[in-house]
Each structure stands twice: as C-alpha cells, then as structure tokens.
Regions:
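Short acidic amphipathic alpha-helix that forms the conserved interface helix of the HATPase_c
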Residues: 44-48, 52
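Bergerat-fold GHKL ATPase/HATPase_c domain
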Residues: 1-45
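Conserved beta-strand-loop-beta-strand hairpin that lines the nucleotide-binding pocket
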Residues: 1-9, 51-140
Length: 140
C-alpha cells in the first residue's frame, strides 16, 4: 500500500446498542484492503475495548484510524472525566464502572490491559476533568 488511508468514527455515549460499530466497520475496511486476519483481529479487539470504555466512562468520543505501509494507527479521544491514575487503570481487574454497567457484563477491568496486549504500542494521555486520548499501533 503506497498511500495512507484514514477513517473517522463517532462513538455514541451511553448506547450499548451501537457500541462496537466502529470496530465492525473497520474490520470490513481492513478485509477489503487485504490485511491479514491476525492484524484485523488485533485491531478489532483494541478498538472494541476502547469504544466500550468511551461508552461506559466518557459519554462517547471519536475513533480515528490510519492505515499506512507499516500498519494501523488507532487514535481514540473523548472529553470524559479522564483517568486519575493510569498505572492503576492498567491493572487487570481494576474498574471504575458502576454496578449497573457490571450487571450488563461490562466493566470487568480488562479493557485497557487488552488494548495494550493486542497492540504493538499504546500511549495514554489523560487529564482528569478534560478527557483522554489513547494512541495505539498494530504493525503489519
């Protein structure tokens, strides 16, 4: 691929019905581009986890995805409450999701750890009261 392709998705907040639509659409786009199934799987998992986090914690946000010769870059950005302690939030099982969200089967504290696990690089910038920006990359 000699060119760079970009995709933009809005993520609705507090809407579990539409949660995951961006990752499903991106999965289709990557298949059409002939990207390997393993890369598609990794991108889909990381994006889905990020979307769910934006729905649960931030009232929505945006996902911007760039596909270039080297891989897939995913930028998730929201204007939610921010992450107070990123190191703690990265611990498997740590969650600030309320009980009503947990009763739906979400909020198990695996979102951020899974995002890191399935990407080659992940960087989190967050300011409490302002929002969060997560940049991930999955290399080919």
């Amino acid at each position: 691929m000699s060119e760079q392709l970009t995709f933009h998705f809005e993520v609705d907040g507090d809407n579990f019905t539409s949660a995951g639509q961006a990752s499903v659409m991106m999965k289709k786009n990557l298949r059409q581009l002939g990207i390997s199934p393993d890369t598609i799987r990794r991108v889909s998992i990381a994006m889905y986890e990020g979307e769910i986090n934006m729905v649960i914690h931030a009232g929505g946000g945006a996902a911007d995805v760039t596909v270039d010769e080297e891989g897939v870059k995913i930028v998730l950005e929201d204007q939610g409450p921010g992450i107070k302690d990123i190191e703690q939030a990265m611990q498997e099982g740590f969650s600030t999701a309320p009980d009503n969200i947990r009763s739906l089967g979400f909020g198990a504290g695996m979102g951020l750890p899974n995002m890191k696990r399935y990407t080659d690089t992940m960087e989190i910038e967050s300011t409490p009261g302002v929002g969060t920006r997560i940049t991930m990359r999955v290399n080919f």
